[in-house]
């Protein structure tokens, strides 16, 4: 992995991921500093919004795999449900095989195929690769970029961050935690807070 200017230090990342042992945080530092550049998540407002979201989704880098019940929602990952069709799950067992993995959970055969093309790795044949720090990070940065979230992060307002959350989550689940993380990471990265809505 080529060396690029660091966007994050180890001390910053461990402070951001408070409660997570440093030995669990360290494997993510190099992939983050690389893929944040690759996907142009490379300014303090972009980094803050991205990290706040992935820290919420992954429990401060503790989890890279969806906890499987299966819950009633997860049972709908299996064909022939409408949700399974949307996820591209066509074969029995696809729901469990293609459960959410990565720092922003990639879910479903279709999305695994898409990220396989983007990252030149066969995650359909080897889905657990997305649990590894390198690919968990790369897939999250890919997801962020493909959903057009950098321009929203540039606004650096609460309303823009709310729109980012909706685009990632489909709603506002965990909003209070996502917002608290965003504000705290902004402070760690030295970003001044802006009004809730940008001035026209």
List PLM regions with ranges.
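Acidic helix/loop microenvironments that form the catalytic cleft of cell-wall polysaccharide enzymes
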Residues: 54-57, 152-174
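Low-complexity, Gly/Ser/Thr/Pro-rich intrinsically disordered linker/tail segments
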Residues: 167-200
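Short, mixed-charge amphipathic alpha-helical segments
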Residues: 37-42, 125-131, 156
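N-terminal carbohydrate-binding/catalytic regions of secreted carbohydrate-active enzymes
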Residues: 16-48, 168
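Proteins synthesized as precursors that undergo proteolytic processing into mature forms
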Residues: 135-139, 146-155
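Non-transmembrane alpha-helical segments in soluble domains
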Residues: 33, 51, 140-141, 165, ...
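Peptidoglycan-targeting cell-wall enzymes and recognition modules
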Residues: 2-26, 52-143
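Extracellular/periplasmic catalytic domains that process cell-envelope and extracellular macromolecules
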Residues: 42-46, 96-99, 135-136, 158-161
